[in-house]
């Protein structure tokens, strides 16, 4: 259970809120690089932390992220002309460069020098790993560049997609760090099923309810689900949570070679989230079959590539098939992440967490809330929150079958490149 006051504290992210101020200490994924494919291409609307922005790539290939609304009469710069190193409002011809400076006014005499008094809000950007990231905080507090391991893989070895989730960001994050739901909600009933999900033979499904261990670190936490398989062995699956909204988890390609994957739950505003989904291989280029979006429900066949809204959504009950639910899969909904969105959106835009009843299986959710509340407090007191140092960029997540008497940390932590563990809960 979370008090109503703390629920408000964690879920409200717009400017001037404590959580919004904490979020502005981190690099935030803003859009996919292919959305701005070339200099002087059309601008793109972006909404981050309640701010309505527009992104553009200028004639010199520089990326601008500025207030969407022209300061003259508040017309949208989305309709503007991206030309000659600036974005020009089509209403009265005011033009702004990537730094937000007004560089030309078509309706005012040059002799007045009025343009020198006008600017729009602009934010720092960097293109890393096929994603354009934004920093909305104070320049002197800018953190290390977001060079996560997946962003450094060759373009042929990684893939990134995104999809809108119609809930507050915390619902998505909590669903991501909640491992106990996966073998329940995402299971399929037949060993030879072609539907995405955990088959009856998977250790997730074969084992009993997991024991969860959470190790708090200087970036967030690493956590493991320990599932008994038989008298001799346990299945261990580890994850990483990096403040404020990153998850890293182990996956596997259709061909069987390891793939690392994860999600980033980016708050658009208090009630909508843009979920960035990434996967990469350390050993081989990704094939079309390898790309997890096909199984997760995040690909072009499932998500409109203009609006980034899922074709399976609350307005059509996520195309739930009751016959499939009866005979083939636990939910009857196609796509693992589509199932996640369906259930998380069913909880309302912002969950009333004061009405929850949490148990031991919710340990990772509880600890995530504690760390986020601590980050809010740290920032409000002028400190530096966890997760901005950049020491965590090489983190990985792994899974394996180990003897029951094995020390899973000793066996697996070296493969996770984890930094200092501070406490265990």
Regions found by a protein language model. Give the residues of each.
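Short, charge-rich amphipathic segments
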Residues: 4, 18, 22, 102-114, ...
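A short, structural micro-pattern
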Residues: 24, 119, 126-128, 259, ...
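Rieske [2Fe-2S] iron-sulfur-binding domain
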Residues: 1, 32-159, 209-211, 231-234, ...
């Amino acid at each position: 259970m979370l008090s109503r006051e703390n629920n408000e504290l964690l879920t409200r992210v717009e400017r001037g809120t404590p959580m919004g101020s904490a979020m502005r200490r981190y690099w935030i994924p803003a859009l996919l690089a292919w959305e701005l494919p070339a200099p002087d291409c059309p601008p793109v609307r972006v909404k981050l932390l309640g701010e309505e922005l527009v992104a553009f790539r200028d004639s010199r290939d520089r990326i601008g992220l500025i207030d969407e609304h022209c300061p003259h009469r508040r017309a949208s710069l989305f309709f503007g002309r991206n030309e000659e190193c600036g974005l020009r409002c089509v209403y009265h011809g005011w033009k702004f460069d990537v730094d937000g400076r007004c560089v030309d006014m078509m309706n005012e005499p040059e002799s007045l020098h009025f343009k020198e008094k006008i600017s729009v809000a602009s934010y720092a950007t960097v293109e890393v790993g096929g994603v354009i990231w934004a920093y909305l905080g104070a320049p002197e507090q800018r953190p290390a560049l977001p060079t996560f391991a997946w962003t450094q893989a060759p373009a042929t070895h990684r893939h990134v997609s995104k999809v809108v989730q119609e809930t507050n960001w915390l619902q998505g994050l909590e669903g991501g760090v909640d491992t106990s739901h996966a073998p329940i909600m995402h299971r399929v009933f037949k060993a030879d099923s072609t539907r995405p999900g955990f088959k009856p033979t998977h250790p997730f499904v074969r084992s009993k309810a997991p024991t969860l261990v959470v190790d708090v670190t200087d970036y967030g936490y690493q956590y493991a689900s320990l599932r008994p398989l038989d008298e001799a062995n346990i299945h261990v699956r580890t994850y990483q949570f990096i403040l404020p909204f990153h998850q890293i988890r182990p996956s596997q390609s259709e061909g069987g070679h390891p793939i690392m994957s994860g999600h980033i739950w980016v708050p658009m505003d208090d009630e909508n989230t843009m979920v960035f989904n990434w996967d990469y291989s350390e050993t081989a280029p990704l094939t079309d079959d390898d790309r997890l979006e096909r199984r997760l429900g995040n690909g072009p066949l499932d998500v409109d590539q203009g609006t980034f809204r899922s074709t399976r959504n609350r307005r059509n009950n996520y195309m739930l098939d009751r016959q499939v639910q009866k005979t083939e899969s636990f939910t009857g909904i196609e796509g693992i992440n589509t199932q996640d969105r369906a259930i998380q959106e069913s909880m309302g835009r912002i969950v009333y967490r004061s009405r929850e009843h949490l148990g031991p299986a919710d340990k990772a959710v509880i600890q995530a809330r504690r760390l986020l509340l601590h980050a809010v407090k740290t920032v409000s007191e002028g400190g530096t929150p966890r997760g901005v140092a950049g020491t965590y960029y090489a983190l990985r997540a792994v899974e394996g079958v180990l003897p029951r008497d094995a020390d899973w940390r000793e066996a697996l932590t070296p493969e996770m490149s984890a930094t200092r563990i501070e406490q265990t809960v």
